[in-house]
């Protein structure tokens, strides 16, 4: 509502959408009321399908999205058609495979594996007495560094004393 009232355009990166496990968390910005008039969603295969480095994704710009009275969708289509020749064919085919039943099953297994690792790390760090959060809807864990250490000091501590790159 704030974006629409101010005329702002909100960009949402949805690379981790496949990791969302909570029922009350939207999988797309467009599940939010009014978002089609003020939001652009960026989707990537890098996080859900392990396509990091292959550069395959897509941008959703609703036809309802206007900026200063100008529809952004046709401007983006024109810009994209002029400046970008498309992903290599083999990468497009890999992206297509993501949507097959086998691809979906493999994605689910990979995501489950990453989320299970996050859960083990979270549990282990909590049991070691650290203040941690995360591991829900994304495979990342946030840790409060102990004793006022900076992140670099803690990185060095882990590397030198525990042989972990953290």
Show which residues each predicted segment covers.
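Conserved core segment of the aminotransferase class I/II
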Residues: 31-112, 119-123
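Short, conserved active-site loop motifs that form the nucleotide-linked donor/cofactor pocket
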Residues: 39, 130, 164
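Conserved PLP cofactor-binding pocket of PLP-dependent enzymes
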Residues: 16-18, 134-140, 159-166
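Short strand-turn motif at the edge of the Rossmann-like AdoMet-binding core
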Residues: 14-16, 44-45
């Amino acid at each position: 509502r704030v974006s629409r009232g101010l005329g702002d355009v909100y960009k949402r990166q949805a690379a981790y959408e496949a990791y969302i496990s909570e029922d009350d968390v939207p999988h797309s910005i467009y599940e939010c009321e009014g978002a089609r008039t003020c939001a652009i969603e960026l989707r990537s295969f890098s996080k859900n399908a392990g396509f990091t480095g292959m550069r395959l994704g897509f941008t959703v710009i609703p036809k309802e999205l206007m900026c200063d009275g100008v529809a952004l969708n046709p401007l983006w289509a024109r810009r994209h058609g002029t400046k970008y020749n498309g992903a290599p064919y083999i990468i497009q085919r890999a992206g297509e495979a993501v949507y097959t039943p086998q691809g979906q099953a493999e994605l689910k297994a990979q995501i489950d594996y990453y989320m299970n690792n996050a859960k083990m790390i979270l549990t282990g760090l909590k049991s070691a007495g650290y203040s941690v959060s995360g591991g829900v809807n994304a495979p990342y864990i946030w840790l409060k560094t102990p004793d006022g250490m900076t992140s670099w000091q803690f990185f060095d501590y882990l590397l030198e004393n525990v042989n972990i790159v953290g």
